């Protein structure tokens, strides 16, 4: 392996990336073979990266000519990703050796696009949309750049030069950004320029503008995929049948296995598959890959559909691989009849040894590989009838043991499993593997674009082989990089282990990054969609800092969450100069500077509560909240209060603060305002929370499975203080108004009837964003009858507010 790592580092790969590639049983042999084909031992980084990209995109059609492309890269004939993409497409249909001149023309070999040509090409595009650019200004910049990148005359131009020229021409046309491009900044500048003593209004907060599906899919290779019917088939009639069935429309699918909850990585897959279909006027199916009856559960079937809909997508059809069990069985028989499938009785150890073993030695054919077709058909029938024990017989595909791709080493097509299937019961005791069922289900459904993550790159060759072997329509498989985030793990096996050890309670624990867990925490689905769409679609496998996701969550909640006051750790305050029965209604906005959220009224009385964090017994010059003999403002209350006495319990803890309401005489404006909650039972104040759950990252390190930083394994990296529970927190009555507003909507009634309460989200002012947890006891009847006493409210912190350097002052 060390030799492979050194060899891959010669391409310019970083040591970590080289080690990862060398350990990839699918990628390593392909990349090693391409390096050998070039006849070189050292490469500059651009050349090395192109060879690496080629290794990740080789398919059966391109394999006979992969070495040719590698040599073209090494000699500089293919010098860009665009040229490489064109080369692989050409080689899928034609022989470059026999048609070298045509290959060169198709791939832009030797084409040099000069600076003047770049300028002219960019100018042509900008002139064609000049009116809309002048109207939209910099808001239309992204769309314009996408059009420039697709301009035929700029196809082989240096992308860096194109971008620089584009920026220069946009600046010349529109001038520098001004108030038309940032209205909030314009208002701020206008206010600052006025010589007035009148109070200056705070600038309008910048609107959250999440990335769209169109922006996610408008750049890179995914924006240049084939049109339906352009993908080559083993015979022409298959294309005609396919187009007749699809009417030329795009059809994609999202194919999860129902053996667990979907996670944050699946959010990207859902957006890619459903999004590609939506943006191309097509449809997307939800197909459950339910070929393993031992792993699947109805709970996960229901959860997956619910999660897809929660993210805002609706499948055109809801299908199951098990819908096609009879058809798949018949295709397996056809595979055997074509001499391309055989029944094998080898053990796992024998199969591993025949494939070269751990030493990667020579591969040898299984002793059953050349058994007569009639014998394999008879043995397959015995398997179907349950006359073999599990693992005593399997159906294997007769591919190519000499191929450098391990996916071609006669993979298993069918195996014996004596388990009851969640849909077909005990009808079957033989089940197709993923390798057999996946591509054939795609074919049966006439999928035009089979979009999956890059770990299936080498599986693409076997995917195409099988479709051709049984003479069915062959979809195109295209891969993109999967998504992970830091400070978590997504493996179901590992999550179950930490659950069984008691570190979490369930797989929807709000500290996890399964989608049901994020939903339970209160994360809005539009924030998750915005996060994955902003990242775009590339072939790179990315682990994104979780802070980036949290920023999207925070920005989204800032737009949609009403503001209410809460005190998590209350201290009683008595305003000594107000009468016992003092009562005043204070009108509060649900969101300052946004009238669309409306207002609500809360009581202001002689007794109220503030948070313990807003009081100090020992004052300091840089502290501006409440302290003995010091005043502070109360949010939206006309006058400040000043602390005159601290009363304590026998144990020394604070019993209550005696304060004076400074409503007589002229008072200086307080430097700070704090939240408060009135003690007014007749007005239902305060609203008492049973629990406030404060969540922090479950793991301490960005990668809990990295042996270099976490040598004792991911269990040792668990933050045992990642959940804090506060009892006795108080909230103003505005929370109940928010709940009643939600319950008054049709959508709210429906969700509450299913006990889905996570859509009830608020900002606790100066604290963070929160949502009701499913452990809340809250009925529609209680809400309609204003029966707050029987409610048992449990609330989760979704995310903190943005860091504020003055928050502790």
Question: How does the language model describe each region?
Answer:
Residues 278, 309, 336, 340, ...:
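Hydrophobic/aromatic-lined pockets within catalytic cores
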Residues 338-495, 503, 553, 562, ...:
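Active-site cores that bind ATP or allylic diphosphates and position pyrophosphate for catalysis
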Residues 456-457, 464-466, 529, 533-535, ...:
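Core subunits and conserved enzymes of cellular information-processing
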Residues 160, 256, 264-267, 298, ...:
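Conserved structured core elements
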